[in-house]
Amino acid sequence: MRMNRMSRARARTALALAVAGLAAGATAGAGPAAAQPKAAPAPPADCSAAHRIEQKLANGTTWRMCWRHSGMAGIVLEDVSYQPPGEARPITVLNSAKLAQIHVPYDDGIEEYADLTDQYFGDGLLNLTPGECPGGTIRTVRVPDARHSDSTDVKGLCTTTRARGHAYHLQSLKPDMSLGKLYQKQGKDLLVYAVNKVAWYEYITEWRFQDDGTIHMNVGATGSLAPQSYDAGDGQGWPIGKGAKAKALSHSHNVFWRLNFGLDGSSKGRIEQYDSKVSPPAPGKPAPSNKTTRTKVTKELAGDAKNMRWWRVVSATGKNKDGHPRSYELVPGPTAKYPGRGFTKHDVYFTQYNKCEQYASGNPHCPDGHPTTVDKWVNGQTLTNPVVWVNIGFHHIARDEDQQPMPVHWQGFSIAPRDVTAMNPLTPKELAGTNGQLDEGG
């Protein structure tokens, strides 16, 4: 049975209808620009044309992927590959990427929701209007149990491109230190996004694919504050409206993503953790020193972010033209970690692949007796096929400006290429011969 998150609102139907009415009203031979033998056309992503996304961006980078819809997770991306200029074939990055939970505990300790697995997040897909997908294509998504559409065919997935500003800026210098040539390029991104409604909240699930190989994964919460929760106690809410009569109840949004990497076509990547430590100036040295240490993560891990700590997923098979193993680095965004539940206590989890482990909590696919939350899956298994779970939290203390509608507040993270290519994939051809050299070519 699918739960109804709006249970507290039933006693206030008139108010609900009034708010609903408002809602209606990124050596020369190693450089990316070096001449390459003409390659055969890259094969399309392994899915039907209707579920295939392929976009060549203005700077020459091509992204390819498949998509499908899940009643719980919403839009799921699969077989994601990246082909920058100068690479003869696509480089597989991800086998799959999806939301794995939106955990919403309220500060009063009474209400707590799992918006994916309890509320069937995917069934709340909304139709998009052309104005919401400027310059792009709105794709039709089959949603058998669509909650907010008269049809099971929901026009709910936008793919478009968008300028992001400077990809780089280099003012070169001549030997006499006067200004030489200016190298600058404007970046372009592929955006893939959908909007899902869960009770009063609406969530924009966005993937942003830069022309330099970076992928941003974000969720934007918008819609409306829950009007049945304007009765918060002291220390658990914020006054909105006239005076202090209406206090919106504070709550958290703990968003999880599940990433199954497939770098260079292999799921057998490895995980590495890096920590840097700053020490006081040593005798005879004028400044502090900083040393970075690598730790190989060979077994499952519940990881906590720290200053100067980061992780990367390293390809088991692929190397760039410099002979360095390809990898992607995890770049978390701002977070407010929620310690109230075991599975929300950590920032990232690395678990051994198990087909039934699909959601960070409330996982419905595993057999009886199997733990249902991601923290319980970290039990010492050796990592040969790691799955990455990222947790980004946001503590929402409302403000007057949150009504009405509520401005989008974003939370998310990125994965950035580290040694995927031998140089910046957007390097101009005049600088292609500077790999590992200091000469700016100016």
Segments the model singles out, each with a brief description of its role:
Residues A39-E206, Q210-T214, S224-G233, I240-G442:
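Extended effector regions of multi-domain proteins
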Residues M1-P37:
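Secretory targeting and sorting signals
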